[in-house]
Amino acid sequence: MESVRLLVLVLALLWSPGASGLRFIGDLRMDLSAVIRRVDRSFLSVTVDASLAAEEKFMSLLSSAKVRTLAKALSPSFLRFGGTRQDFMEFSPQRSHQDSGSTEDESCDQLELPSWLENQLKKAWTKQQLTLMREDLHRKYRRVKFTEDTVDLLNSFSVCSGMDLIFGLNALLRTDDNIWNSSNAGSLLQYCESRRYRMSWELGNEPNSYEKKAGVRVDGLQLGRDFSRLREMMSQSEFYRGAGLFGPDVGQPRDRRVDLLEGFLKTGSEAVDAITWHHYYVNGRDTSLEDFLDPEVLDSLALKTKEVLEKVRLVSPEKPVWLGETSSAYGGGAVGLSDTFAAGFMWLDKLGLAAKLGLDVVMRQVFIGSGSYHLVDENLDPLPDYWLSVLYKRLVGPEVLKVEFSSVAQRKRVRLYLHCANRKSYQSGAVTLISMNLSQKPVWISVPARVSSSTVEAFVLQSDRPEEEGLYSRCVTLNGVVLKMVDDRTLPDLKGTRLPPDEHLQLPAFSLAFFVLTDAGAPACK
């Protein structure tokens, strides 16, 4: 097997007494001859939380020119509309299907939100979030009715942003026999078909928690039968016969959740196109900065993923497995952490590790919605994880390559992943080294002579403030320049810094980076 062993001298600056200054830490081995995994083209995807529709007027924020500009940069992507409140929502049509509504033929510019209304909604959303937080805290959720307007706005947003919509249906509408009552979903499918809205579907959100949230217990076997019923409904529709269906969106493995997943796989695996589960590292109400930088916390994803994959492979070996909802901390995120630069270490490591382990899609909770783990804040401004996501989209291809780091001492805090570069941005044969330095000391990676002729483009993300203080910042720099929108319709140029041949690749303290070896000539990437 043709293999390229890239000796990468990792030099760390040591401050301990008697240290000579620089020390050889270990070497990096890259196999550029073979692809070990290939993820979906929409691997990095996003969600819009159903909380946005708790009061339907807030759905109009999806018509903001600024929000749509930000969303377009994340295409191609799945756009999942769902979350806790999807199981407390009912479709309540208010007009005949012949009435005017948005269509794919309309200009996206015609559907934009006026600036005065956008400002009004942003102010009101601040108050709305407090109401939503109280509901989450007490697990008391209002029953919400949504109209065609919500569906129209979601369709328009997904079409104009170049995203593929996945709509989450209410699974808590149940008969006296505890069977899913599909009549409301039938009305929604009928409306969407009349408008020719192309979308996929889900049914229910974290069914493992229904007993706590709604006093209803649904086992996995019944849930699988409910999905089979939905698939039957879709097959009766000429328009949605070939549409996607994903589920069961169960929480990460733990006791009953494993039983629920196993039961679902027995009766529902053939109904779905991918198995979905959710993952969060920590409790947002009981965490710290140390958790966000703890290698053991980051490594916990591997254990959970392997457990889910083992269960799925026993029943449906070829079925794709997705992280259908994920972020740093559950419970709406960790205030003062999930929306800061520090959250980027969890996010980028999750993307790298998930692809390496064999997950096909990772859906980030949340692009816009309640909580503190969003990519776009309450003022509709992009947060650090947004910029990280855009760079990932532009620089990283779907092909995963093998990379090994020999130093046991540093491999936990210097985390590295390797992909073919995105071929829309770079020529074939280019590779992208995804790099993270979780320590407060800088690290240097020395590219060996074997690839010294390759141009290297460096994209180094750091906080706009120094040292540990900067980890709490909501601003990020790319190669020293603060990232912010030029205007509501324009993102800044996200240009890398070209490094001369034989230059050490510097990974500063507390930094995230993409190093693109543009002329690596990797056989696996041709």
Provide a role label for each language-model segment.
Residues E2-A274, A302, K306-G324, S328-K526:
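Non-catalytic accessory regions flanking glycosidase/transglycosidase catalytic cores in CAZymes
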Residues Y280-V297:
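Active-site His/acidic residue clusters
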